């Protein structure tokens, strides 16, 4: 599985990408919305994890571009946000996001959601 992880929080992206790589996931990390769109065009991933609030345009703007481009429109997009406003979830799903997760999220739970999205078997995760 190849995942494009787009979030301006470098500590979070390092944490998530390290955890995903430990599970054998190829992870490409970018830190702004425009980089996310350009990276997906250059080398389409299996799934995109996109933060709502980033520099270089919002994650919502990137999601719109991703869904309008013939090259990226069918790639599943999972959106992360620290916002608990129900409107955020409704907006991103209306724009084509397949899933919406509230931060904080860890690599194990993200991996489980990614496997579900891509219909891959998920290993059992031990409770913490």
Regions inferred by a protein language model and the residue ranges of each:
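Acidic catalytic/metal-coordinating carboxylates
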Residues: 32-35, 58-64
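The feature encodes the CheY-like receiver
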Residues: 13, 55-56, 73, 85, ...
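Active-site residues of response regulator receiver
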Residues: 51, 81
């Amino acid at each position: 599985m190849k995942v494009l992880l787009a979030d301006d929080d470098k500590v979070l992206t390092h944490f998530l990408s390290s955890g995903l790589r430990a599970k054998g996931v190829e992870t490409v990390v970018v830190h702004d919305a425009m980089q996310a769109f350009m990276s997906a065009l250059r080398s389409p991933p299996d799934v995109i994890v996109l933060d709502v609030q980033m520099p270089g345009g919002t994650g919502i703007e990137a999601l719109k571009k991703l869904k309008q481009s013939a090259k990226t429109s069918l790639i599943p997009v999972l959106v992360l946000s620290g916002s608990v406003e129900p409107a955020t979830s409704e907006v991103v799903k209306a724009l084509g996001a397949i899933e919406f997760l509230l931060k904080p999220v860890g690599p194990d739970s993200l991996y489980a959601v990614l496997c579900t999205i891509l219909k891959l078997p998920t290993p059992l995760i031990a409770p913490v």
